[in-house]
């Protein structure tokens, strides 16, 4: 351990000597060497050897012969040389990055890249590549999820006729499953009913035994009365059971009838679908004798409300309408000016109508005005009749009033 410590201390001294060299003169250096450094001659030689070792280690293997000649001078040199060679790269790093025409690519304190780091990077890269290949083959369900096993059929590829066979198979399978479930439920319900009956019968037996023990203690007359009561109770219970069974049988029958009707209707619908698969079945078919558009349902339900369509006849309108009625023609509505009544009737028969609200309003006005029409003679007769009736009423009222006034005045005169 002594030579190693000695090899480190001269390095520090050498660096200190380099720093001091420009300030001191050569005489002072000699004087400092002569008295003091007799003991440390080996140290100075080791300094020289350290410097040579640094330069030789960086310049190459060609200078190894010189190192051998320096080693032969003293044992201290040969002991201190390997330690100097060990510390050579670190000393060169602390000093400049250029020695003997050889420059380090990294410079400064950065170490050389090791082979282990490269091998680690290569192994990590290979692992990453293999992992990505595996993900590409198998997929990552936690990120993307799985695709559907049975995708929905395309409307262009699969027509409804092609899809009928799988539909029938699925319906048959579902119906068989439903039948199995119903059978299981019915069996469970029967077992429960049997258990309940057994419990009831056991309770009845216990009651009977208790009643028998009580009846033994009582008289014979009481026992006969109890027997009759029991018989009556038994008969009532039997009647109730029969009624329940009858109800259950009726329910089962109704369920069977419903199933049969539903099955028959489904079969009929399937047959119709096979005959005409492209028919629209969203609307229910209702036989209608009417030709043209149907009347709106809102008007049919508005019988309770008073209709308030249009207003009174305009001046001259009644006479014009009366002429149409006399001729037996259809009265034209407003908005139909320019067309004859025959043309309008032919258009309506073929299915042409006005826009919805206008058509309803004008049709109602036309019907109301047709009912209002009177000829001029009828109007005169009505007016004269009304006037005569009014005069008669007035005369009656006046006559009764005169009589009353006369009676009162006559009674006063007599007094």
From Swiss-Prot:
Residue numbers spanned by region Necessary for interaction with CIR1? 177-272
Q: Can you supply one Gene Ontology CC term for this chain's record?
A: nucleoplasm
**Region called Disordered, residue ranges:** 1-311
Q: Which Pfam families match?
A: NKAP, Nkap_C
- Compositionally biased intervals (Low complexity): 23-32, 54-71, 84-108
One MF annotation (Gene Ontology) recorded for this entry: chromatin DNA binding
- Compositional bias segments (type: Acidic residues): 212-225
Disulfide bonds, paired cysteine numbers = none
**Which residues in this protein are found as N6-acetyllysine?**
110
Tell me the compartments it is located in: Nucleus
Q: Name the family.
A: Belongs to the NKAP family.
Q: What task does this protein carry out?
A: Acts as a transcriptional repressor. Plays a role as a transcriptional corepressor of the Notch-mediated signaling required for T-cell development. Also involved in the TNF and IL-1 induced NF-kappa-B activation. Associates with chromatin at the Notch-regulated SKP2 promoter.
Protein name per the record: NF-kappa-B-activating protein
Query: Gene encoding it?
Result: Nkap
């Amino acid at each position: 351990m002594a030579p190693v410590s000695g090899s480190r201390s001269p390095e520090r001294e050498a660096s200190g000597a380099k720093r001091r060299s420009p300030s001191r003169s050569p005489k002072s250096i000699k004087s400092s060497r002569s008295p003091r450094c007799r003991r440390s001659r080996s140290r100075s030689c080791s300094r020289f050897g350290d410097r040579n070792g640094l330069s030789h280690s960086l310049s190459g293997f060609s200078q190894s012969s010189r190192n051998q000649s320096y080693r032969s001078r003293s044992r201290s040199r040969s002991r201190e040389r390997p330690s100097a060679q060990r510390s050579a790269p670190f000393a060169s790093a602390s000093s400049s990055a250029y020695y003997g025409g050889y420059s380090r690519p990294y410079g400064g304190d950065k170490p050389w890249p090791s082979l282990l780091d490269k091998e680690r990077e290569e192994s990590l890269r290979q692992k990453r590549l293999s992992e990505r290949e595996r993900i590409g083959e198998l997929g990552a369900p936690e990120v993307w999820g799985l695709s559907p096993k049975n995708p929905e059929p395309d409307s262009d590829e699969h027509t409804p006729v092609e899809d009928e066979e799988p539909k029938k198979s699925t319906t048959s399978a579902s119906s068989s499953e439903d039948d199995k479930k119903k059978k299981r439920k019915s069996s469970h319900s029967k077992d429960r009913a049997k258990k309940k009956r057994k419990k009831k019968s056991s309770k009845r037996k216990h009651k009977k035994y208790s009643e028998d023990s009580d009846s033994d203690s009582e008289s014979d007359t009481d026992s006969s009365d109890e027997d009759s009561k029991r018989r009556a109770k038994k008969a009532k219970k039997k009647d109730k059971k029969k009624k329940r069974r009858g109800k259950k049988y009726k329910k089962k029958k109704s369920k069977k009838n419903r199933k049969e009707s539903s099955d028959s209707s489904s079969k009929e619908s399937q047959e119709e679908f096979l005959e005409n698969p492209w028919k629209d079945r969203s609307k229910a078919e209702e036989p209608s004798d009417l030709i043209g558009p149907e009347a709106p349902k809102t008007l049919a339900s508005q019988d309770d409300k008073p209709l308030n369509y249009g207003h009174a006849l305009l001046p001259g309108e009644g006479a014009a309408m009366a002429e149409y009625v006399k001729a037996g023609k259809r009265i034209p509505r407003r908005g139909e000016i320019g067309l004859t009544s025959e043309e309008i009737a032919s258009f309506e028969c073929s299915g042409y109508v006005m826009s919805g609200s206008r058509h309803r309003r004008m049709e109602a006005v036309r019907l109301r005005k047709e009912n209002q029409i009177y000829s001029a003679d009828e109007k005169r007769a009505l007016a004269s009749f009304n006037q005569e009736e009014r005069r008669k009423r007035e005369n009656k009222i006046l006559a009764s009033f005169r009589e009353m006034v006369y009676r009162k005045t006559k009674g006063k005169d007599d007094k």
